[in-house]
Amino acid sequence: SGGQYKFGTTDVTRTICFSKPSQRIKDIFTYVLKGHIAVATSDLNKHDTGKKIDTRARRYLKKKNLDYAHGTGHGVGFFLNVHEGPQSISKLNKIKLKEGMILSNEPGFYKKNKFGIRIENLIYVKNIKNKICFENLTLAPIDKELINFDSLNTKEKSYLFEYHLKVYMTISKYLSKTQKKWLASFI
């Protein structure tokens, strides 16, 4: 989902499951999540492009001979087009990332006529000490019922905890007691 606002454009995707997910779906969701985290935590030099990051996002799926047929991310416009360049995270993109750019981070996997998985956040490109890194702009919880936590390393578990804590600390003040309790369950 997403929207156009006078002060910016949003784009976010979450996969949720309304029944008990199979182990296969949990495993694939976790590979996608690991790719998503790999992008979000990338520490790049100032000459790196979206192509290098795309490889990181696909790594865990490719180890299982799985992939997705779209770029990992696209540039996001400001009250114009949601998909806007020249920056993107894809196999073909050779544009150097620069501070101030906004991109999506949206690896996924799709099994035709069966299921689809995508985790999408918007990320802001920052330059810190001549390194490129990303700041998450999207604050929406990730369904923990779909995660195989045994497949996450300590860094990935820490990232997920910190992300959910930031989501809670940022938006809980706008929520009812019941909504806060639900949101706290992701931490």
What do these predicted ranges mean?
Residues 1-187:
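Active-site neighborhoods and metal-handling regions in enzymes and metal-associated proteins
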